[in-house]
Amino acid sequence: MVQAPLSPSLLQTQSISQPPQETEALKAWLEELTQKIIEGDRINKSEALTLTQIEGQDSILLLCEAADRIRQACCGNVVDLCSIINIKSGNCSENCRFCSQSVYHPGENSPIYGLKSSEEILAQAKAAEAAGAKRFCLVSQGRGPKYQGAKSKEFEQILATVRQIAAETSIKPCCALGEVTPEQAQALREAGVTRYNHNLEASEGFYPEIVTSHSWRDRVETIKNLKAAGIQACSGGIMGMGETWEDRVDLALALRELGVESVPINLLNPREGTPLGDCHRLDPFEALKAIAIFRLILPQQILRYAGGREAIMGDLQSLGLKSGINAMLIGHYLTTLGQPPEKDLAMVESLGLQGGEAPIPGEYQTRS
């Protein structure tokens, strides 16, 4: 299938204006921009790039306050809680430079195992539900069911497991299996999958720097297949792989144009043995700035704290929830450990927020 191009503006380098430097002037400028967004206007690439020029902790915190106002106005105070399970790990055919599961550069402590049993997956779904998660995502290595054949036994087993989770729990099953055909997307929808994770990972321009075994356009095609089947798209990226601020803005704009509902923000926690294993870790305030800019570009989307938040943010994790974040992945990640769910829930409640299931774009205004 030949993919229609995204807006040409996403691929063009633009000159960058400077934001006001004096504190009160910056406050006034951000207030005007914030009100414009709350009233339903969308910022353009030029305005987003100007936001990237805000420097210094005090000024970044002003940007974070603006993002928090937008989050409150457009999404409310519910923090969406989800959990994941790595149902098949290691020996992945793809060469993603950040990932320790790739057969090209396996991480030293990355587990390798085949597809877990339905019983084991169901047990972990029930544990995630008991811990407070509202969604439970089945994540598998590999390029995807699209390349396993129309009668893949593995895909059929996953569909059966999804049906079992839907029947025996109240947690909502999600999947992240890689690329799918329109027919497979429909089968997932009929089994009970209402949201599917397939991260763009980076901007189209930067993508070849981190993956060459498949294209960015391949990922876009799968997102379109999912949405055509009536499945919500969960798609975001990773910060800290060497991308520029313009790359980050282009990623957010592409996600906006695709109409994704949920946007995971991963902060690279470099894995030893991978090509990005020696990457310099993001400064927490750079991460907060990126989160805030994503919120200004994506005012109604579910913006999710995902991998790397504990390692990168440390004691500043809670600031993310006051900088535009309104969702969290709780529990463990694919190949690294997370903090105890009860600690996450306590952090959410300490900020006057509540764990639950956040509204998708447009739903909060409807509820209100």
From Swiss-Prot:
Annotated EC: 2.8.1.6
Catalysed transformations (reactions): (4R,5S)-dethiobiotin + (sulfur carrier)-SH + 2 reduced [2Fe-2S]-[ferredoxin] + 2 S-adenosyl-L-methionine = (sulfur carrier)-H + biotin + 2 5'-deoxyadenosine + 2 L-methionine + 2 oxidized [2Fe-2S]-[ferredoxin]
Entry keyword annotation includes Metal-binding: yes
Keyword tags: 2Fe-2S, 4Fe-4S, Biotin biosynthesis, Iron, Iron-sulfur, Metal-binding, S-adenosyl-L-methionine, Transferase
Pfam family, one: Radical_SAM
GO process annotations (BP): biotin biosynthetic process
Pathway where this protein functions: Cofactor biosynthesis; biotin biosynthesis; biotin from 7,8-diaminononanoate: step 2/2
InterPro entries: Aldolase_TIM, BATS_dom, Biotin_synth/BioAB, Biotin_synthase, Elp3/MiaA/NifB-like_rSAM, rSAM
Disulfide bonds: none
Domain of life where this protein originates: Bacteria
Residues reported in the UniProt entry to bind [4Fe-4S] cluster: C92, C96, C99
PROSITE patterns: RADICAL_SAM (PS51918)
GO terms of molecular function: 2 iron, 2 sulfur cluster binding; 4 iron, 4 sulfur cluster binding; biotin synthase activity; iron ion binding
Occurrences of domain Radical SAM core (ranges): 74-309
Cofactor annotation: [4Fe-4S] cluster; [2Fe-2S] cluster
Keyword S-adenosyl-L-methionine: yes
SMART domains according to UniProt: BATS, Elp3
Textual note on the cofactor: Binds 1 [4Fe-4S] cluster. The cluster is coordinated with 3 cysteines and an exchangeable S-adenosyl-L-methionine.
HAMAP family, per the entry: BioB (MF_01694)
Assembly with partners or alone: Homodimer.
Name the UniProt record assigns to this protein: Biotin synthase
Source organism of the structure: Rippkaea orientalis (strain PCC 8801 / RF-1)
Lineage, broadest ranks: Bacteria, Bacillati, Cyanobacteriota, Cyanophyceae, Oscillatoriophycideae
